[in-house]
């Protein structure tokens, strides 16, 4: 795969934002109060299940996360703390951006049209775009399980054929790209054990799997020199 052959990158939200870290930092203190505390994997599964249950009952990401906190507390048989639920609801808009993301998207924007693929529910897109140094050429916010029409509309609006876009997904279980496997895709594994830019995949033109966006930007530089 030659990443220089594409006109656009379809970046899923979790390639830019450490969503799982934000979720766990907000819910671990609650889980610790339970007689049967959940581990991180169980907390993330509970978050995803409750998000689906509440998605059509609330009108804003802040309200969704506040109610999600209260609902999880009830499931754990804990009296939900109002202030804590409000804090969790507000914190969702400030989940940490990966350290490499701002610089990487700034570099990649010089060579690609950038398309943001948002999760289906519970995300404040404006809070992310305000914290990045570049504007996205298009934003796809899936409204249901089949978000192909929204993607097709976004690509048409920026005059990029579907074959000209390279999807870039995270390793999260509910990454939006996981439901579309009918064309080549890049995966960011975010392997913190290896330094950025030194993984073999950054230097291997036959694969598209990187440890970070910085890794991918470095691979692009190598491809230009090849």
Model-derived segments and spans:
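N-terminal helical cap/lid subdomain that shapes the substrate entry/recognition surface
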Residues: 2-99
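Helix C-cap/helix->beta junction micro-motif
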Residues: 34, 76, 110-112, 181
């Amino acid at each position: 795969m030659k990443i220089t052959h594409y006109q656009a990158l379809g970046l899923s939200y979790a390639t830019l934002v450490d969503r799982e870290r934000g979720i766990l930092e907000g819910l671990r203190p609650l889980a610790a109060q339970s007689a049967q505390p959940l581990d991180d994997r169980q907390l993330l599964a509970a978050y995803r299940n409750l998000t689906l249950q509440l998605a059509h009952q609330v009108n804003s990401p802040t309200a969704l996360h506040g109610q999600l906190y209260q609902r999880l507390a009830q499931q754990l048989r804990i009296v939900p703390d109002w202030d804590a639920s409000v804090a969790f609801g507000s914190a969702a808009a400030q989940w940490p951006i990966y350290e490499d993301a701002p610089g990487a998207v700034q570099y990649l924007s010089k060579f690609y049209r950038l398309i943001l693929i948002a999760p289906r529910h519970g995300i404040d897109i404006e809070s992310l775009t305000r914290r990045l140094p570049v504007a996205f050429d298009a934003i796809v916010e899936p409204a249901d399980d089949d978000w192909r029409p929204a993607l097709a509309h976004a690509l048409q609006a920026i005059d990029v054929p579907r074959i000209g876009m390279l999807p870039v997904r995270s390793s999260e279980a509910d990454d939006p790209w996981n439901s579309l496997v009918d064309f080549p895709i890049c995966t960011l594994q975010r392997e913190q054990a290896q330094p950025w830019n030194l993984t073999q995949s950054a230097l291997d033109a036959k694969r598209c799997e990187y440890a970070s966006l910085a890794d991918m930007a470095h691979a692009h530089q190598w491809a230009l020199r090849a």
